[in-house]
Amino acid sequence: VDRPDEAAARDIFSKYLSIDLPLHPDDLANHGDDPKETIRALIAETAAEMYAKTDRTKFIEVTYGTTGKEIFYFKDFASGAMIENIVARTKKYAVKRFLAGGTKGISLRDLIPAIAEEYKENEDLPNTTDPSNWALISGKRSERVTNVKSLIDLLASSRLVEDVSGGQYL
């Protein structure tokens, strides 16, 4: 089964984001108070963000024996399950916001962080210790993979470095 491209991702999102879900009033207002148009826009903007080729969505760099290097982005590893997880996170964020006294309804402000969190959870996906596996993943089965380097910079600014007190060491 091929990985979904952006159009297929929009189709998958439409299975999980429907007009029967509560939508944030700001998002509704931005789309003429039309739930169908709001859902369409949320799906389009979310898929565009998910499939963006930016520095923060770079995942790995594969070096081939004869043809040079290729950059893979998180989008290259997208799946229906990943999209389902993004929507589940989005719903969780919306419910938590509402329970904390915020406005009810799913918003683009819930979807975008859900993408980042899903990508962050999948940071350990690539096994960079065995470059030969990447020939299969990259679709260049006849190419010899000589190196795989992680390029993960996603959410780097939000990673917390903590000072911990000394303790016992084994």
Residue ranges and their predicted role:
Residues 1, 21-23, 128, 134-135:
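Short, surface-exposed linear patches
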Residues 2-82, 92-101:
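Conserved C-terminal "switch" segment of AAA+ ATPases
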Residues 65-170:
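C-terminal engagement/docking regions of AAA+ P-loop ATPases
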